[in-house]
Structures are given as structure tokens and as C-alpha cells.
């Protein structure tokens, strides 16, 4: 008797239903009481290593522990799992990164004591390698965190303009900006903030432009790209 092979459809990720704010509330409800700056420090210092571990682990769900706190992540870094559906309230490494960055921002924005503790303990490698330190401000420094683009209002458009500079300075494919260009700014849709918040975007862009990484000149193509966002150099 011949072998029978039955193929069924695999549900695709429905990005339209994912609301980062709702996901963050669920994350805080589950992990908020345990979170501390040491855990955040361990996470960001080991995020690259964690991504590598996930890419080599053939398990759709993986438990990772940072600073004594266990997080169960949907593994969308293993090659065969990149298209697997992710429930709206589930954690991925990217979402965890954004949630932790927002948690730090929420803890520190009106509390100088906590801000001083965060500045002492937390290191954001992606910011440091670009010459950005805590002295540039909470929102710019944490805005370098992967996933921070989910919270453009919290991080004052810095994740967006950091990606702009990556396109201009590092040669990052502009298509990678599709994710940040879909995000909301508070209650504003992407279509709304792109017309109503141009001045805020320009201010954030110019602030990042003061970093040594971003100070070199702009090509004509780069100027044309920036003009699409109302930024004229």
C-alpha cells in the first residue's frame, strides 16, 4: 500500500490584530511584579546571544531566563519557524525587548532615583556602538532597543529616526522600515502622525544627527529619502 501524505494549510501570522499596548499590559500583569533593573541589564547584554541560541534550537517554544526571571518565548528565529503564527499576547524576543525598554522608561520618566539606578545598571549595546549614552537622554538611549518602535510615543519617535539613520549611514535596506512605519503614535495611526507630527520627527532626527555616527554628509539619494518625511537637509 502506498504511503499517504496529507498537507494542510498553516495559519499565517495576522499582524493586523496585534496591539503592542494590549500586549504590554498582559506582559506587565504576568511579569511586572518580578521585573527589576538587573533583569533588564542581563537581557540587553545577552540579547544577541539569546537570538543565536533561538536560531539553533528546533523548538517552537523556548524558556529563557534572565536575572532569575523565566520568560517563555515563541521561537521565530529557528529557520523553519520564522512564519509560525504568534498569539497576540505571546512573547517573542523582539517583543520582550520592546516591553522591557518601555518598562524602564515608565519606571524612570518621573522618578530621578530610579533613573539614576537604571543609568548605573543598564547598558544598551546597540546604542553604545553608535556613540549614544545615557547622557543623550532616556528616550534616545532606550529607543535603540529592538521592539522600541512599538511605542513611538513613549520613545518620542527615536526608534523611527534611528532606523532612518541606519538606512542612510549603515546601508540598511529601507524595506526594514516597514514595521516602524506601520506603528501608531499614541492614538494616532501611522497615516495621521506622518502628517501631524512632522516637526517632532524632524526634531528627533536632528537630535540623533548630533551623534558622531550620524554626522557625515548626505548623498542626493539620502536627501530625497529624507524629504519624504518632511526633513530637508
Swiss-Prot record:
Gene3D superfamilies: 1.20.142.20, Bunyavirus nucleocapsid (N) protein, C-terminal domain
Binding site for RNA: 48, 51, 76-77, 95, 123, 125, 128, 166, 182-184
Record's keyword terms, sorted: Capsid protein, Helical capsid protein, Ribonucleoprotein, RNA-binding, Viral nucleoprotein, Virion
This protein's GO CC annotations: helical viral capsid; ribonucleoprotein complex; viral nucleocapsid
Compartments, record wording: Virion
UniProt GO molecular function: RNA binding
Function of the molecule: Encapsidates the genome protecting it from nucleases. The encapsidated genomic RNA is termed the nucleocapsid (NC) and serves as template for transcription and replication. The NC have a helical organization.
Family that this chain belongs to: Belongs to the orthobunyavirus nucleocapsid protein family.
Domain notes from UniProt: The N-terminus and C-terminus are involved in homooligomerization and play an essential role in viral RNA synthesis.
Quaternary data: Homotetramer. Binds the viral genomic RNA.
Protein name per UniProt: Nucleoprotein
Organism field: Aino virus
Amino acid at each position: 500500500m502506498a504511503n499517504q501524505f496529507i498537507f494542510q494549510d498553516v495559519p499565517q501570522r495576522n499582524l493586523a490584530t496585534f496591539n503592542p499596548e494590549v500586549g504590554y499590559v498582559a506582559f506587565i500583569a504576568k511579569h511586572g511584579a518580578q521585573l527589576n533593573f538587573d533583569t533588564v541589564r542581563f537581557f540587553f547584554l545577552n540579547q544577541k546571544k539569546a537570538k543565536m541560541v533561538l536560531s539553533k534550537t528546533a523548538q517552537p517554544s523556548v524558556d529563557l531566563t534572565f536575572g532569575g526571571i523565566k520568560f517563555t518565548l515563541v521561537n521565530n528565529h529557528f529557520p523553519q519557524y520564522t512564519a509560525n503564527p504568534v498569539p497576540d499576547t505571546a512573547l517573542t524576543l523582539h517583543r520582550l525587548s520592546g516591553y522591557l525598554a518601555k518598562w524602564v522608561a515608565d519606571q524612570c520618566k518621573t522618578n530621578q532615583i530610579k533613573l539614576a539606578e537604571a543609568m548605573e545598571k543598564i547598558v544598551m549595546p546597540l546604542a553604545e556602538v553608535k556613540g549614544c549614552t545615557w547622557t543623550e537622554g532616556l528616550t534616545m538611549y532606550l529607543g535603540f532597543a529592538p521592539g522600541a518602535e512599538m511605542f513611538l510615543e513613549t520613545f518620542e519617535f527615536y526608534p523611527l529616526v534611528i532606523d532612518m539613520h541606519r538606512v542612510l549611514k549603515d546601508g540598511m535596506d529601507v524595506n526594514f522600515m516597514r514595521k516602524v512605519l506601520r506603528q501608531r503614535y499614541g492614538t494616532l495611526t501611522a497615516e495621521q502622525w506622518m502628517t501631524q507630527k512632522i516637526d517632532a520627527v524632524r526634531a528627533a532626527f536632528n537630535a540623533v544627527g548630533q551623534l558622531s555616527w550620524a554626522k557625515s554628509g548626505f548623498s542626493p539619494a539620502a536627501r530625497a529619502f529624507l524629504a519624504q518625511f518632511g526633513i530637508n537637509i
